[in-house]
């Protein structure tokens, strides 16, 4: 394992605060989607918060393993799940953007770009057509 102390700290911080970070990320996401409350209904916010909490856990695991593909693959899998429920795949990209913005704003040590390569890998993977 090639994890640096900074990556180890960031992964632990994400795990410890994933529920709160997921809530903030979901709030950002809902600001980006016109009519999100109507589209996703009464339990929509909580469903997205739970889903983004799981994505943040995947990011923490990817950080610990120093494996960008691990996070990218999780986001591609998530897109498959979301689109199977007839939800626009674009919302997954917006969710990824919202998580990145939230982590950069909320976590110490992430403004140096240390998590960017994980998000960049996920963006690249999501740009590929779904199979």
Briefly describe each language-model feature range.
Residues 1-93, 97, 102-131:
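Core of compact, soluble alpha-helical bundle domains
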């Amino acid at each position: 394992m090639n994890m640096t102390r900074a990556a180890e700290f960031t992964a632990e911080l994400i795990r410890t605060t994933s529920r709160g970070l997921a809530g903030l990320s979901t709030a950002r996401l809902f600001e980006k989607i016109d009519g999100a409350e109507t589209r996703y209904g009464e339990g929509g916010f909580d469903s997205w918060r739970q889903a983004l909490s799981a994505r943040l856990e995947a990011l923490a695991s990817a950080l610990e393993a120093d494996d960008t593909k691990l996070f990218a693959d999780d986001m591609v899998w998530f897109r498959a799940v979301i689109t199977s429920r007839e939800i626009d795949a674009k919302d997954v990209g917006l969710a990824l953007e919202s998580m990145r913005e939230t982590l950069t704003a909320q976590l110490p040590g992430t403004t140096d770009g240390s998590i960017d390569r994980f998000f960049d890998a996920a963006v690249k993977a999501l740009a590929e057509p779904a199979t």
